[in-house]
């Protein structure tokens, strides 16, 4: 370097006095010294920068870096102070570097050099870290060596029977081996150690796998281990030229470490403190490595990353969510696929711009609407094609399944959907690797303004109602592969979707229980952004780029939602994230009263080598409750067995890890609690449950588990976590399966309830969601008798009598649930059964027996969409209940009086259970002691609009107990046949011989009826069916709800109707006619009572009436199938005449159907109150001993005993081996024992914790444990 380059610093030094130079060098020396000792010093306020040209060589390379950024770690590592010992600095510059000042003597030179401290690059590595950190690094180095040995064993023992599978697996193993070796090399350099690992035996195929590995994009994540050392901040090893591109970063795990994060991420970390904070993380969380950072150009970026830097998505902490908490969100929760499919059908139907779908498994031929028949217009492929033809862009991401493990037909689904229209684009991902992990997200996004997240795929085997029917011999609801039972038979060839895979007359289907959440506003935008990031990461040049919608949205709801993910670079193109696990841990730690979990799997840290801490936190919270003598409950609902045959290897593996978490092992949940708390009854604190049901199929009883596929957790009636993540490492570790979930709270819309006997303020949304789930499990919801069952299916005692040839009294006992149509058509003669079972008395006709709280129902899990989406206002589909309960204020118990053959009368109390023998546990009578579940403004009778409507449509009080006669014409039914409801349970029971019939529901006149179009907002739906002498009344009046929680940026106006003077006059005339007809009917009833005592109707007359009823139903079905879409105007044109006809809606829906899609569940009313009148069960307090032991535990114990007694070959504690299980499958069901099934209540059973206890369930092959964890 020339002398001119050295003269400016020398001249500057001569002009300054000597002491200031010494102070400057002292200041810089201390600064460098502290920086070398503390990496966290980067985030502190540094000392003022000094011009280093005055005492360092101008020609030194690090000078530019120092001037550009004096506070970064890379600068401190690259900064080099020249001293007399730096003889290797290179070339002629070494002599000039030794001269700081030509006018100073040698002693001054030495003194100045002694004041310059060594830099971080000149410090030995073992001085830069604490002893604990070095110990952790050493432990990790040993662990990496063991993992490399395991990889070698797997490479050497790999079977080459299948060349394609051999290459795929070897590529994956080679990739893992390379990643482990890179990390081990970094640790060796840090610790100054030498690690030697034996290389695997070479094979001829290694050259091919190496070439493919170089071509295929590799995952950024460098950690395949679950237990790695912790560190406070990411430690970048870039201190010399050999490691400028390598780094080692670990995630914060302790309270102290999380508070000392680096300054580069402090702003984004603080962004989440109001929602999910790392300060609440358990100190027992084993850390895991985060992806390697690319530190080139002093920027923390990822190669090919699509995550914008400087945003919350770029947060380096994998435990924190990338998306912020969103306030004022409207949330709808859907239980079982019947409700969700109807809501999704309406949402897609009303899409105007875009539809995004992600799926683990997708069947284009799945039917979304199945009542009153399988609707071809709402088959998924037809619906998507129709919307694509209307100009809507449809983008779908499917998991490209591993062919060696499963076959879900993703290629067929992609080809079929893309053939429908050019506006449908489908991506399969990943192309080859990773082999073991999957895309497990299940989402539906409409116009980036409404989103659904949960565990439901649009595929076969998912559709179900809350009754979970087992049989469908006539393919009424489940067609072809949709009738599915993987436990007793395979799905078969998925390429032939409408061929049955099992024999419907011998094998029951496996019911499916699942949950979805719908959100709007910014929460939906977050789900859309997740999809867009994934799409842009997965796509190739053929597919278009997607863009995020930034249009402002107005908040309309009351809930707080935060999007959680399990993602990695391979699955989403960004940094690793496992915020779902963080949310679960924090919610469990913060629980005060109870935890309710439904999940497909339960594999956690109490099983060997499992990382996630869910079970650890549960045990810790239970121990705390025991120590403080608190009342604390943990409900865990999981499947009885996995969806497969128990002899299959993968099913055994799943069972092994689940049992290793719960009970089989010294450190399992139950063994640990029993050992640490030997004097405590653990049933008071934790219970493991499953769901099961039964049916009568072709002369024998069958049973099957209700497969729990939901992934949710409810805490203290205030917090919900719902999504697609199972409780296992696959879903929670972040590096494996891609998952999505929401954590939902609502601190604005609250309700006064009870908790452990004390007054408690709960979230109305969460409280009602729990009620909906528990009513289903306890059997407190009305029966949905569709598809219709055989006549004897619902009366077990009569089936036993039939087999004993006791035919003399059959007609006095047979259940007539499915013959009510015949009874109603033959009121004068038909007395086929004198003992009427009113299992369905909770249905839509008997609404006087249920509580109704208008505001509560608005926040219950919606059962069917009634409000619709349009281009300017987006609303999540809400429920349309089928009862006019808003006008009902009485809650008396209804009894049905029957007449036996001797003429005496017997009163039989109605029940909500499968049989009428169980009358419920009387825990608490409805009185003042029960808490008030609704404020005055919540009650429907306090709504002025509903009061006026009730006054208009309700008959006089004196007529309440008189049977109403028909006033409508059959033509009205045929005109409005799209929405008619003709299920058997909706028909009123025949009049009794000794007592007047039960009071009918309030009537509404046809003048106030609106047949809503799918683009309008909620309304009334009343249809009357003139069937000889009886009336079918269906009231789906969602406009009676005084507040509807809508998922929209702008609420749609509520459609109302005004009654003109002429209409009122017509209504009065109709009421007068009704009174006259009622008087005539009373006379007919008296005559009927006399005839009943004299003679019984002949079988020939009964058959004639039955044929007549069937002909009328066929006529209605033909009329329904002949209706075609209307093609007039885009606007609603209300037209009516003065004759009292119903108001008609004429729309221009193009190729879209005229009516809105409906679910079967929406046609049945379920009380919104926690108190169930029929059974005297109150669900308000989930922790009180009366409910917990008297109802919950007692129901599970009773059902478990009954099922274990009746059915020999089901998962139960007495079966210890697979051989024993196979032998018991050959034993038929005893009809004598089947009488016990009449006592089954709901579908709760205890999980068989000792099932196959004597069987070795652990998989025998290596390197596959993480598949099941």
Curated annotation (Swiss-Prot):
Keyword Lipid metabolism: yes
Record-linked CDD domains: PLDc_vPLD1_2_yPLD_like_1, PLDc_vPLD1_2_yPLD_like_2
InterPro entries registered for this protein in UniProt: PLD-like_dom, PLipase_D/transphosphatidylase, PLipase_D_fam
Annotated EC: 3.1.4.4
UniProt-listed SMART domains: PLDc
BP terms from Gene Ontology: phospholipid catabolic process; phospholipid metabolic process
Activity regulation comment: Inhibited by butan-1-ol.
Domain of life the protein comes from: Eukaryota
Region Disordered, annotated ranges: 55-121, 222-269, 300-320, 810-966, 983-1007, 1116-1167
Coiled coil (residue ranges): 131-192, 803-835, 1059-1096
Enzymatic reactions: a 1,2-diacyl-sn-glycero-3-phosphocholine + H2O = a 1,2-diacyl-sn-glycero-3-phosphate + choline + H(+)
Entry function: Plays a role in cell growth. Hydrolyzes membrane phospholipids, such as PtdCho free headgroup and PtdOH (phosphatidic acid; signaling molecule on its own). Involved in the inhibition of actin-based motility and endocytosis. Its inhibition causes complete collapse of F-actin organization.
Protein name: Phospholipase D A
Species this protein is from: Dictyostelium discoideum (Social amoeba)
Gene: pldA
């Amino acid at each position: 370097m020339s002398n001119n380059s050295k003269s400016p610093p020398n001249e500057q030094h001569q002009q300054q006095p000597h002491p200031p130079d010494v102070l400057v060098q002292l200041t810089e020396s201390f600064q460098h010294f502290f920086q070398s000792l503390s990496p966290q010093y980067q985030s502190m306020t540094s000392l003022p920068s000094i011009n280093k040209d005055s005492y360092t060589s101008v020609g030194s390379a690090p000078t530019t870096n120092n001037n550009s950024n004096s506070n970064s770690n890379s600068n401190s590592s690259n900064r080099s102070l020249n001293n007399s010992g730096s003889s290797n600095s290179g070339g002629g510059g070494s002599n000039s570097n030794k001269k700081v000042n030509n006018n100073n003597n040698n002693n001054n030179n030495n003194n100045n050099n002694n004041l310059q401290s060594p830099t971080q690059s000149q410090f030995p590595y073992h001085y830069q870290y604490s002893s604990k950190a070095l110990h952790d690094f050493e432990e990790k180095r040993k662990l990496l060596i063991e993992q490399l040995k395991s990889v070698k064993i797997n490479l050497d023992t790999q079977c080459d029977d299948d060349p394609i599978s051999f290459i795929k697996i070897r590529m994956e193993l080679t990739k893992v081996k390379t990643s482990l070796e890179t990390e081990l090399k970094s640790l060796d350099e840090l610790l100054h150690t030498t690690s030697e690992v034996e290389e695997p035996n070479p094979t001829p195929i290694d050259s091919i796998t190496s070439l493919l590995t170089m071509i295929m994009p590799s995952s950024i994540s460098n950690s395949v281990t679950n237990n790695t050392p912790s560190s406070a901040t990411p430690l970048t090893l870039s201190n010399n030229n050999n490691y400028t591109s390598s780094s080692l970063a670990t995630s914060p795990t302790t309270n102290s470490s999380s508070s000392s994060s680096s300054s580069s991420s402090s702003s984004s970390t603080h962004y989440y403190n109001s929602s999910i904070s790392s300060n609440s993380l358990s100190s027992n969380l084993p850390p895991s490595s985060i992806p390697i950072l690319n530190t080139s150009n002093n920027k923390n970026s990822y190669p090919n990353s699509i995550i914008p830097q400087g945003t919350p998505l770029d947060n380096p902490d994998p435990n924190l969510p990338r998306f912020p908490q969103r306030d004022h969100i409207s949330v709808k929760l859907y239980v079982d696929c019947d409700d969700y499919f109807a809501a999704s059908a309406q949402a897609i139907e009303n899409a105007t711009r875009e539809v995004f779908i992600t799926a683990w498994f997708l069947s284009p031929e799945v039917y979304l609407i199945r009542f009153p028949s399988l609707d071809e217009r709402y088959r998924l492929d037809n619906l998507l094609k129709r919307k694509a033809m209307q100009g809507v862009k449809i983008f779908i991401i499917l998991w490209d399944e591993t062919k060696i493990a499963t076959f879900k037909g993703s290629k067929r689904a992609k080809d079929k959907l893309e053939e429908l229209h050019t506006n449908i684009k489908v991506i399969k991902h990943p192309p080859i690797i990773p082999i073991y992990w999957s895309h497990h997200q299940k989402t539906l996004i409409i116009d980036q303004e409404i989103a659904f997240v949960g565990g439901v795929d649009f595929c076969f085997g998912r559709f179900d109602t809350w009754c979970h029917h087992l049989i469908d011999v006539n393919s009424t609801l489940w067609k072809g592969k949709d009738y599915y039972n993987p436990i007793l038979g395979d799905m078969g060839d998925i390429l032939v979707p409408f061929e049955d895979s099992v024999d419907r007359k011998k094998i029951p289907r496996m019911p499916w229980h699942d949950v979805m959440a719908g959100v709007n506003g910014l929460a939906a935008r977050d789900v859309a952004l997740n999809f867009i990031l994934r799409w842009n990461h997965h796509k190739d040049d053929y597919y278009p780029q997607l863009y995020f919608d930034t249009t402002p949205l107005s908040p309309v709801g009351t809930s707080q939602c935060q999007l959680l993910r399990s993602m990695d670079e391979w699955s989403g193109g960004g940094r690793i994230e496992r915020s779902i696990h963080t949310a679960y841990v924090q919610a469990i730690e913060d629980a005060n009263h109870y935890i309710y979990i439904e999940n497909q799997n339960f594999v956690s840290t109490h099983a060997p080598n499992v990382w996630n801490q869910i079970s650890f936190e549960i045990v810790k919270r239970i121990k705390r409750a025991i120590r403080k003598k608190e009342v604390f409950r943990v409900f865990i609902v999981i499947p009885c067995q996995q969806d497969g045959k128990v002899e299959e290897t993968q099913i055994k593996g799943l069972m092994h890890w689940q049992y290793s978490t719960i009970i089989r092992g010294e450190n399992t949940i139950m063994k640990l609690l029993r050992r640490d708390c030997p004097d405590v009854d653990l049933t008071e604190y934790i219970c493991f449950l499953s769901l099961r049901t039964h049916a009568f199929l072709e002369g024998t009883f069958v049973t099957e588990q209700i497969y729990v596929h939901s992934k949710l957790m409810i805490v203290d009636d205030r917090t919900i976590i719902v999504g697609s993540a199972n409780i296992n490492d696959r879903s929670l570790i972040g590096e494996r399966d891609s998952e999505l979930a929401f954590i939902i709270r609502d601190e604005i819309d609250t309700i006064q309830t009870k908790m452990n006997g004390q007054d408690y303020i709960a979230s109305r949304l969460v409280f009602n969601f729990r009620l909906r789930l528990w009513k289903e499990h306890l059997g407190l919801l009305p029966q949905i008798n569709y598809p219709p069952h055989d006549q004897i299916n619902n009366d077990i005692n009569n089936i036993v009598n039939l087999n004993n040839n006791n035919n003399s009294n059959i007609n006095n006992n047979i259940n007539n649930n499915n013959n009510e149509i015949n009874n109603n058509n033959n009121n004068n003669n038909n007395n086929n059964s004198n003992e009427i079972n009113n299992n369905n008395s909770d249905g839509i006709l008997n609404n006087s027996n249920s509580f109704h709280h208008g505001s509560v129902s608005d926040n219950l899990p919606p059962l069917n969409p009634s409000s619709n989406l349009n281009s300017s206002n987006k609303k999540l589909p809400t429920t349309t209940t089928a009862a006019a309960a808003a006008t009902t204020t009485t809650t008396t118990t209804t009894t049905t009086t029957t007449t036996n053959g001797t003429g005496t009368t017997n009163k039989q109390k109605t029940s909500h259970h499968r049989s009428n023998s169980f009358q419920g546990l009387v825990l608490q009578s409805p009185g003042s002691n029960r808490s008030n579940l609704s404020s005055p403004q919540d009650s429907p009778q306090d709504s002025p609009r509903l009061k006026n409507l009730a006054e208009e449509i309700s008959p006089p009080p004196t007529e309440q107990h008189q049977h109403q006669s028909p006033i409508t014409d059959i033509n009205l039914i045929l005109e409005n046949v799209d929405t008619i409801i003709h299920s058997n349970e909706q028909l009123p029971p025949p009049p009794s011989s000794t007592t007047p019939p039960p009071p009918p529901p309030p009537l509404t006149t046809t003048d106030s009826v609106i047949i809503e179009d799918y683009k309008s907002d909620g309304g009334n739906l009343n249809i009357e069916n003139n069937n000889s002498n009886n009336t079918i009344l269906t009231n789906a009046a969602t406009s009676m709800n005084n507040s509807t929680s809508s998922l929209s940026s702008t609420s749609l106006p509520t459609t109302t109707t005004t009654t003109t003077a002429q209409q009122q006059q017509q209504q009065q005339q109709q009421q007068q006619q009704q009174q006259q007809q009622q008087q005539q009917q009373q006379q007919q009833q008296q005559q009927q009572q006399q005839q009943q005592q004299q003679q019984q109707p002949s079988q020939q007359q009964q058959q004639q009436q039955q044929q007549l009823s069937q002909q009328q139903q066929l006529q209605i079905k033909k009329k329904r199938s002949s209706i075609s879409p209307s093609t007039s105007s885009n606007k609603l044109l209300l037209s009516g005449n003065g004759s009292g006809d119903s108001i008609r809606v004429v729309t221009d829906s193009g190729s879209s159907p005229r009516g809105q899609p409906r679910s079967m569940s929406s046609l049945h009313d379920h009380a919104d109150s926690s108190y169930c009148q029929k059974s005297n069960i109150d669900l308000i307090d989930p922790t009180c001993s009366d409910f917990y032991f008297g109802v919950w535990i007692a129901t599970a114990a009773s059902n478990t005993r009954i099922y274990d007694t009746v059915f020999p070959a089901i998962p139960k504690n007495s079966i210890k081996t697979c051989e024993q299980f196979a032998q018991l499958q050959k034993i038929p069901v005893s009809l004598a024992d089947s009488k016990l099934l009449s006592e089954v209540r709901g579908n709760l059973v205890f999980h068989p914790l000792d099932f196959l206890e004597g069987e070795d369930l652990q998989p025998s092959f290596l390197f596959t444990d993480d598949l099941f964890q």
